[in-house]
Amino acid sequence: MTDSVRWDLDGAVATITLNRPQARNALTAELKTELLGALGQAASSPEVRAVLITGAGQAFCAGQDLREHAGLLGAGRSQDEVPPAAGASPAGAPAAQAPAGSASAAGPPPPGGPAPAALDTVREHYNPLVLAIRSMPKPVIAAVNGVAAGAGAGLAFACDIRIAAQGASFLMAFARVGLAADTGVSWTLPRLAGAGRAAELLMLAEPVRAPRALELGLVNQVVADTDLVAVAGALAARLAAGPTAAYAGIKEQLNYAAGHGLADALEKEAEVQTALGRTTDHQAATLAFTRKEEPRFLGR
């Protein structure tokens, strides 16, 4: 890893830390690339059986680094020989990023519009990051130690379990800079809080403190700021000692059921159960149950 992302392996738990505390762990292109690499390493490493994502310093992640984004927007305008269209935003305005699924029917950006690097970060960076978390065949926990804004909140919502410090907060900041949701928020937020509440949080773009986030279902647990590392670490260690293949099957079922009807979900359950029934963990755990012993899961 580089200075932007830290990787620590403690037993079977990989901790991935966003490491730009001076910028509240805002997401630059470098950080996004390194984070995707860290997630890939966690997914492919047999010694890793649970993943913990957190932020260095006082923030979890402030979302897109708008200084970098504004620079890319300005570069796009300065490289175009045609002057900006009437009414176009001035150079550096952060309102031209085109999220995946946004209304593109209006056509391409006006002459002098933003550079592709500014427009394409959703498809090139954010979408792969969310898919890497959701498809990770291991539990992924977010330890939200401070503000999680915009894409930072999206990364937390993509995780399987979220534990927040008492002083943490969430902010659907997209509309504040003239954007709609990205980083999977249009998919995860309605499933966590309901469609109506998701619309409210996205449109009003007001901070949600950790206790309120717990009430809304955005997080699973809120703990004292000083207890976050210990509580999240203990949960990660517990999951790392569990039936890893079963956890992967659970994630596969939940992801599949989110886009399919009951009959298809039932068939997916049967398919996954059949595969898991052949695992060493299932057979050993069944034998341990009959002997009234505690099972010892090997993750396979």
Q: In which residue ranges do the predicted regions lie?
A:
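Terminal peptide-recognition signature
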Residues: 16, 20, 35, 53, ...
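Crotonase-fold acyl-CoA enzyme core
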Residues: 131-247, 271, 275-279, 284-287
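Residues at secondary-structure transition points
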Residues: 22, 26, 33, 113-127, ...
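Conserved CoA-thioester-binding segment of acyl-CoA-metabolizing enzymes
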Residues: 1-58, 70-72, 76-77
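Glycine- (often His-adjacent) and acidic-residue-rich active-site loop
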Residues: 55-132, 176-178, 261
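Short hydrophobic/charged patches on amphipathic alpha-helices used for structural packing
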Residues: 39-40, 127-130, 153
